[in-house]
C-alpha cells in the first residue's frame, strides 16, 4: 500500500530582510510566486495534501500557493515562536494520521522532488526522523550534521560546535521528514529552554534518539536548499533557476545562441529545433512550436508561435497572440489578441490588436488596427490573401474581404468586399513653385526675429 504524506510548508515569516510591503514568498521566480514553486516540488514528490502555515498576507499567500491537484489547507501562526511552534500550528492536519510528515519552507523555491522522495524513503526504511542536508564549501553559520554508523546523532549549531565539528561540511537545510504516527508526540516534547525562548524543530533529532528512535539524513544539492531572505538572494535564485531551465531545454533540442541572455517563465514551452536568438524574454504563457525562430530582443507573453513561424527582431507578442504555421511578425511589431493565419506576414512597424488575419495576407509597414474607442475594444477581420498598404489605419469594427487591396495611407472605416480596392485618403495636389515662396517667407520671419534679439 502506498504511504500517505502531508507536507507542512512554513510560510509565516515576517520577511523583514526582504524590505518589502508583501511577504517574501509572494515574490516571483520566473514569473511565479516562489511559494508556488515549493508546492510544485511537493506535488512532484507524490504529495497531494499540504498544510500551509501562514502569517503575513495570509490570504494572498494561500491563493498564490494554489495549484491544480493539490489539496491545501491553511493554518495561521499568530505568534512567531520558532520552527517547532510553526509546525504545530498545523496540529489539526498532522493529527489526521498520515504515514509521513514532510516539513519544508516556502522561501526555498529551487527545491526539487529528488531529496523530498529520498527523505520519505528514509521513513519507509524505518527512520523516525530524516533530515535533509547539503554539502558546502562555506559551512560557517550553518548547523552541522554529525553522523555515526549511518545515523544522525546531532545537529550542532555553529556557536556550540567544537573545532573538529566546525570542519564538517554537511549542513542542515531545515527540511525534514517525520514519522507521521509519532509526529505529534515528538513535536509536543520540544521545549523552549534556550536564549530566545523559542521552539526549535532541530530538537527533534535529540528527542527521537532519546526515545530509542532512528534518525538519519539524506543529501541534497546545495543550490536547491538556498533560502531567500533578501533581494540579493532572490537574484541568485532567479539566475540559477534560469540556468537550470535553459540547460534542460537545450538538452531537449532547443537552440539558444547566447543562452545566458534568454529569460524564461516557469511555464514556457519551446519545441524541438526552435531557434532562440540572444536577448529574448518570455513571460508566462508562451508556447513556441518546433522549428519556430525567435529573433533577438523580442518579448513574448501569453502567446503561441506555430511551427516554422518567425518573430522579431524587436517584436512584442502580448496575451492572445497566435501565429499560424510559417507566419511572420517582424521588427518593431506588436500583436495583442491577434491571430495570424498560415503564411501571413506582419513585417515591420505595425500594431495588431484584437484582430484576425487570414492565411497569406500581407500587412504593410506602419499599419494599425484601431481597436479601442476609449471605452470598448472591437475586432478587425482581414480575409485570406489580402494586401494592406503601408501606413494604413483600420478602424474597428471592420472587415476586409479575401484578396482585397487597401491603398497605402488609407483610413478604413467601412467593410471592404473581397477582391475590392479601397482608398481612404485625401487626393494629392501639386502647386508648382509654391515651395520657393514658403521658404522665402520662413527665412524672412527668421531674419526679423534675429534682428529684434
UniProtKB/Swiss-Prot annotation:
Keyword Acyltransferase: yes
One family name in Pfam for this protein: Hexapep
Subcellular location: Cytoplasm
EC number: 2.7.7.23, 2.3.1.157
Entry keyword annotation includes rRNA-binding: no
Residues the entry annotates as binding Mg(2+): 107, 229
Gene3D superfamilies for this protein: Hexapeptide repeat proteins (2.160.10.10), Spore Coat Polysaccharide Biosynthesis Protein SpsA, Chain A (3.90.550.10)
Enzyme class: transferase
Record's catalysed reaction(s): alpha-D-glucosamine 1-phosphate + acetyl-CoA = N-acetyl-alpha-D-glucosamine 1-phosphate + CoA + H(+); N-acetyl-alpha-D-glucosamine 1-phosphate + UTP + H(+) = UDP-N-acetyl-alpha-D-glucosamine + diphosphate
Cofactor(s) listed in the protein's UniProt record: Mg(2+)
CDD domains: GT2_GlmU_N_bac, LbH_GlmU_C
Pathway where it operates: Nucleotide-sugar biosynthesis; UDP-N-acetyl-alpha-D-glucosamine biosynthesis; N-acetyl-alpha-D-glucosamine 1-phosphate from alpha-D-glucosamine 6-phosphate (route II): step 2/2; Nucleotide-sugar biosynthesis; UDP-N-acetyl-alpha-D-glucosamine biosynthesis; UDP-N-acetyl-alpha-D-glucosamine from N-acetyl-alpha-D-glucosamine 1-phosphate: step 1/1; Bacterial outer membrane biogenesis; LPS lipid A biosynthesis
Chain positions covered by the region annotation Pyrophosphorylase: 1-231
Region (Linker), start-end ranges: 232-252
Subunit structure: Homotrimer.
Main function: Catalyzes the last two sequential reactions in the de novo biosynthetic pathway for UDP-N-acetylglucosamine (UDP-GlcNAc). The C-terminal domain catalyzes the transfer of acetyl group from acetyl coenzyme A to glucosamine-1-phosphate (GlcN-1-P) to produce N-acetylglucosamine-1-phosphate (GlcNAc-1-P), which is converted into UDP-GlcNAc by the transfer of uridine 5-monophosphate (from uridine 5-triphosphate), a reaction catalyzed by the N-terminal domain.
NCBIfam families in the cross-refs: glmU (TIGR01173), PRK14353.1 (NF010933)
Protein name: Bifunctional protein GlmU
Organism annotation: Rhizobium johnstonii (strain DSM 114642 / LMG 32736 / 3841)
Gene, per the UniProt record: glmU
Amino acid at each position: 500500500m502506498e504511504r500517505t504524506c502531508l507536507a507542512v510548508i512554513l510560510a509565516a515569516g515576517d520577511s523583514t530582510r526582504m524590505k518589502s510591503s508583501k511577504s517574501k514568498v509572494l515574490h516571483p521566480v520566473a514569473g511565479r510566486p516562489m511559494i508556488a514553486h515549493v508546492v510544485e516540488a511537493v506535488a512532484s514528490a507524490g504529495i497531494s495534501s499540504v498544510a500551509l502555515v501562514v502569517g503575513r498576507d495570509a490570504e494572498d499567500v494561500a491563493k498564490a500557493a494554489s495549484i491544480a491537484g493539490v489539496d491545501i489547507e491553511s493554518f495561521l501562526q499568530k505568534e512567531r515562536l520558532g520552527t517547532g511552534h510553526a509546525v504545530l500550528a498545523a496540529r489539526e492536519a498532522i493529527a489526521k494520521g498520515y504515514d509521513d510528515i514532510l516539513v519544508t519552507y516556502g522561501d526555498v523555491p529551487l527545491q526539487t522532488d529528488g531529496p523530498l522522495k529520498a527523505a520519505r524513503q528514509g521513513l519507509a526504511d524505518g527512520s523516525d526522523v530524516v533530515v535533509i542536508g547539503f554539502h558546502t564549501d562555506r559551512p560557517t553559520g550553518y548547523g552541522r550534521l554529525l553522523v555515526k554508523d549511518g545515523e544522525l546523532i546531532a545537529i550542532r549549531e555553529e556557536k556550540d560546535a567544537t573545532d573538529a565539528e566546525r570542519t564538517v561540511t554537511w549542513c542542515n537545510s531545515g527540511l525534514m521528514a517525520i514519522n507521521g504516527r509519532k509526529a505529534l508526540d515528538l513535536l509536543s516534547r520540544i521545549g523552549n529552554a534556550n536564549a530566545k525562548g523559542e521552539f526549535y524543530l532541530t530538537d527533534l533529532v535529540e528527542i527521537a534518539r532519546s526515545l530509542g528512535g532512528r534518525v538519519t539524513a539524506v543529501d541534497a544539492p546545495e543550490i536547491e536548499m538556498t533560502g531567500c531572505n533578501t533581494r540579493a538572494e532572490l537574484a541568485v535564485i532567479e539566475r540559477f533557476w534560469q540556468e537550470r531551465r535553459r540547460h534542460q531545454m537545450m538538452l531537449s533540442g532547443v537552440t539558444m545562441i547566447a543562452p545566458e541572455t534568454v529569460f524564461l517563465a516557469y511555464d514556457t514551452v519551446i519545441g524541438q529545433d526552435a531557434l532562440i536568438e540572444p536577448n529574448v524574454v518570455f513571460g508566462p504563457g508562451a508556447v513556441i512550436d518546433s522549428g519556430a525562430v525567435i529573433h533577438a530582443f523580442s518579448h513574448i507573453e501569453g502567446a503561441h508561435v506555430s511551427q516554422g513561424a518567425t518573430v522579431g527582431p524587436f517584436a512584442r507578442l502580448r496575451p492572445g497572440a497566435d501565429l499560424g504555421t510559417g507566419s511572420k511578425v517582424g521588427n518593431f511589431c506588436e500583436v495583442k489578441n491577434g491571430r495570424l493565419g498560415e503564411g501571413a506576414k506582419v513585417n515591420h512597424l505595425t500594431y495588431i490588436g484584437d484582430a484576425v488575419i487570414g492565411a497569406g495576407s500581407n500587412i504593410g509597414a506602419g499599419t494599425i488596427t484601431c481597436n479601442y474607442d476609449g471605452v470598448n475594444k472591437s475586432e478587425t477581420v482581414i480575409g485570406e490573401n489580402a494586401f494592406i498598404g503601408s501606413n494604413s489605419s483600420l478602424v474597428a469594427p471592420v472587415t476586409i474581404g479575401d484578396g482585397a487591396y487597401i491603398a497605402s495611407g488609407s483610413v478604413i472605416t467601412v467593410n471592404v468586399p473581397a477582391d475590392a480596392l479601397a482608398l481612404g485618403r485625401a487626393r494629392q495636389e501639386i502647386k508648382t513653385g509654391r515651395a520657393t515662396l514658403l521658404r522665402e517667407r520662413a527665412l524672412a520671419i527668421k531674419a526679423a526675429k534675429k534682428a529684434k534679439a
